[in-house]
Regions:
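The feature marks proteins involved in alpha-glucan
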Residues: 1-42, 74-158, 163-170, 177
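Structural beta-strand segments of beta-rich domains
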Residues: 43-48
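Short proline/glycine-enriched turn/loop motifs at strand-loop junctions of beta-rich domains
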Residues: 50-57
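Short beta-strand elements bearing conserved aromatic residues within extracellular beta-rich modules
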Residues: 57-59, 95
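Substrate-binding/active-site clefts of carbohydrate-active enzymes
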Residues: 141-151, 160-311
Length: 314
């Protein structure tokens, strides 16, 4: 038995990190990110982030006037995973990670595992509790278990939530309004599923969502995460499946995002010949890195499990 495995038997809390570094943590979002907790009778938020090259990290946000160093994180594994519990932080508080690079520079990063984010042009992460939504799609879920998904009929309507219909020249429908508009149209036209162009958080409208910065956050352009859950729930109650585009091929170079997350390549391939998509000006994931594998697998399963998405188009 390897020493790491012996340690895990003594302290099961090390298991998420162990699996993460093996590329086998399929629910890394349950550990990393910002999670509401109560410790020693005090409610607050525990923050965890992976940053293998960082010299130091602090959590900054509305709760400390965005002052670097006010809430320094500590390494929980002696290596690359950082953690901090901050009492008093609450849902919807905006935050970022202030990373001190090995070269001494300060960079401000959104949380790769954030469940919610500010609406562009702002780009901070938001504390959010994704639990507690009351689903009403039991009948749909039961029917899908019996359905012949390979040979059964399927007619898919692809659409972009931000431009399909607008309330005026610039304002799109929110998630709830979108469902109310879509359902009668899809039924009338005989579609079985709606396929959404990417709804994971992204900064640039012109990308149509194909330059993702938030792999665990539905875009706040149209509402909150639970608003998006309600969208899926309404579709299922109407007998309509929901497929979403999931974009693991590349990610943008926005300074607050995954690119050079701790001042050096973390999520992207460090070899520029493999790590950059020259045509798009975006970065390519380091698919051979275990931590990146855990990140991407967790993202894919997150949408299926937490949002009841019926399928992903890659």
């Amino acid at each position: 038995m390897r020493p790491t495995e012996e340690k895990i038997q003594k302290d099961p809390s090390d298991l998420p990190i162990y699996l993460f570094k093996q590329g086998n943590n399929c629910e890394a979002y349950r550990y990393f990110g910002a999670h509401l907790e109560t410790r020693a009778g005090e409610s607050g938020v525990v923050f965890r982030v992976w940053a293998p090259h960082a010299a130091a990290i602090s959590v900054v946000g509305d709760f400390n006037s965005w002052k670097p160093g006010s809430h320094p994180m500590r390494k929980v594994d002696g290596d690359s995973v950082w953690e901090l519990f901050i009492p008093g932080v609450k849902e919807y508080d905006v935050y970022k990670y202030c990373v001190t690079t090995r070269g001494g520079d300060l960079i401000y990063k959104a949380d790769p595992y954030a469940f919610h984010a500010e609406t562009r042009p702002s780009n901070g992460s938001k504390v959010y509790d994704i639990t507690g939504f009351a689903w009403h799609d039991d009948a749909w879920q039961a029917a899908q278990k019996k359905a012949d998904v390979i040979n059964g009929p399927m007619n898919i309507y692809e659409m972009h939530a931000g431009s399909w219909k607008l309330k005026d020249e610039k304002v799109p429908y929110n998630y709830s309004e979108l469902a109310d508009e879509l359902i009668p149209y899809i039924r009338e036209m005989g579609y079985t599923h709606v396929e959404l162009l990417p709804v994971m958080e992204y900064p640039f409208d012109g990308s149509w969502g194909y330059q993702v910065t938030g792999y665990f956050a539905p875009t706040s352009r149209y509402g909150t995460p639970k608003d998006f859950m309600a969208f899926v729930d309404k579709m299922h109650e109407a007998g309509i499946g929901v497929i979403m585009d999931w974009v693991p091929a590349h990610f943008p170079k926005d300074g607050f995002g995954l690119y050079n997350f701790d001042g050096e390549a973390c999520y992207e391939d460090p070899n520029p010949k493999r790590g950059e998509h020259k045509e798009w000006g975006t970065m390519v994931f380091d698919f051979g890195r275990s931590e990146v594998q855990s990140f991407l697998i967790s993202s894919a399963l997150y949408w299926l499990e937490q949002y009841h998405i019926d399928g992903l188009r890659v």
